[in-house]
Amino acid sequence: MIIDKVLGNLHDLPENDLAAYTGLHREKVVLPSAQLVKRIQRATTDHGNEIGIRLASGSGDLRDGDILHVADTNMIVVSVLPTDVLVIAPRTIHEMGVTAHSLGNRHLQAQFFDADSEYGAAVMVCAYDHTVEDYLTHAGVPYTRQERVLPVPFRHAEHSH
């Protein structure tokens, strides 16, 4: 089976639309975050069925909860594996600036969340790296190591010096 478009996302559906999918069996395509950026790939569902994913250019990244296929009593949904991350919570704007500058020099991929997010504080989230953890420990910057399903995958930012 070739999947060429995402039909919707379970997390974004209004309650009345979600009811249409309630009785369906959910077959999952479990992907690590790094695979979400690939438009063309092969994947195997948790039932052992192989599928091909061939999304159009510009279709955006896959996300946790994306509905790939619906038929009769079954649906195929993307399930994203948690990513090992460092959740960094600087105490002051100065500490944030110094930390962001130091980590930015490493070309570290990061995501930023505000206090209204699931983190409950303004934080910077980056993929786990032991050298970053060592820097944060020595600099005294508050952080925690967590397993998280991120809303969007880390993506390399193109640049030149």
Curated annotation (Swiss-Prot):
Q: What is the superkingdom listed in this entry's lineage?
A: Bacteria
Task: Output the CDD domains linked to this UniProt entry.
Answer: UreE (cd00571)
**Location of the protein in the cell:** Cytoplasm
- Print the keywords alphabetically: Chaperone, Cytoplasm, Nickel
What Gene3D superfamilies does the database record attribute to this sequence? Urease metallochaperone UreE, N-terminal domain, UreE, C-terminal domain
The molecular function terms of the Gene Ontology recorded here are: nickel cation binding; unfolded protein binding
Question: Gene Ontology cellular component?
Answer: cytoplasm
InterPro entries recorded:
UreE (IPR012406), UreE_N (IPR004029), UreE_N_sf (IPR036118)
Q: What coarse category fits the chief subcellular location reported for this protein? A: cytoplasm
Protein's GO biological process? protein folding
Q: Family, per the entry? A: Belongs to the UreE family.
Task of the protein: Involved in urease metallocenter assembly. Binds nickel. Probably functions as a nickel donor during metallocenter assembly.
Name the NCBIfam families on file: PRK13261.2-3
UniProt name for this protein? Urease accessory protein UreE
